[in-house]
Amino acid sequence: MADSLTEEQVSEFKEAFSLFDKDGDGQITTKELGTVMRSLGQNPSESELQDMINEVDADNNGTIDFPEFLTMMARKMKDTDSEEEIREAFKVFDRDNNGFISAAELRHVMTSIGEKLTDDEVDEMIREADQDGDGRIDYNEFVQLMMQK
């Protein structure tokens, strides 16, 4: 996954890694991670810091080395892309920008891409995604729907 990064990204991440790696030993410890997170306005607990390190600590030595850091950053970038894509897709459906997709908006978009649906089919699609039962799809319901795909 880290091999999908450009040279420029790798060099930016090397710089970021150096900021975390306060003592320059090539390893990020929970203490170093905590220092940087706090400087960014976060306040993670010791166990949260350990969880963050464990998530990417491939060799289970309790610290993050640069290759592990790269893998983590590549993963985060991939997640960000898909989040942005989902947000953009939601905007396409939410034509009046009120934060909800109504049956009429869903029908309009589906028709414009050549999907002729009956009212029952549109209602069924809304029902499948509509978790709070208000008859429309909000952003969180849309995200859940997209993540199931």
From Swiss-Prot:
InterPro entries to which the protein is assigned, alphabetical: CALM/Myosin/TropC-like, EF-hand-dom_pair, EF_Hand_1_Ca_BS, EF_hand_dom
GO cellular component entries: cell tip; central plaque of spindle pole body; cytoplasm
One Pfam family matching this protein: EF-hand_7
One Gene Ontology term of the molecular function aspect: calcium ion binding
Key words, A-Z: Acetylation, Calcium, Metal-binding, Repeat
Binding site for Ca(2+) 4: 130, 132, 134, 136, 141
Record-linked Gene3D superfamilies: EF-hand
Binding, Ca(2+) 1: 21, 23, 25, 27, 32
Function: Calmodulin mediates the control of a large number of enzymes, ion channels and other proteins by Ca(2+). Among the enzymes to be stimulated by the calmodulin-Ca(2+) complex are a number of protein kinases and phosphatases.
Note: This protein has four functional calcium-binding sites.
Name listed for the protein in its UniProt record: Calmodulin
Organism: Neurospora crassa (strain ATCC 24698 / 74-OR23-1A / CBS 708.71 / DSM 1257 / FGSC 987)
Taxonomic path: Eukaryota, Fungi, Dikarya, Ascomycota, Pezizomycotina
Gene this chain is encoded by: cmd-1
